[in-house]
Amino acid sequence: MALFSEDLPAQQFEFDPTKSAENFHKHGIDFEAAQRLWDDAKLLELPARTTDEARWLVIAVLDGKHWSAIITRREQRIRLISVRRAREEEKALYESEEF
């Protein structure tokens, strides 16, 4: 089931600052900037395929570019795990009329 940003309350974020810096070096976006993904009214949040903790794939547009984030929820906070440019199939899902 996809969730849209308007279905969610105001978000609070947490992340590892070292991992944020590594993410910037690898993918060109840090976790401070990535929080703006939640400003996208069309943001999609889908269950990620994981076997350990519950994780979510978030697809949104920021500054005209599609991004994908992996997150987990801890109490009332969103923990950012990684953010990268969206893959073609993720872009297609975001742009599809199914949601």
Where are the regions a protein language model picked out?
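Ribonuclease/tRNase effector modules and their secretory precursors
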Residues: 1-99
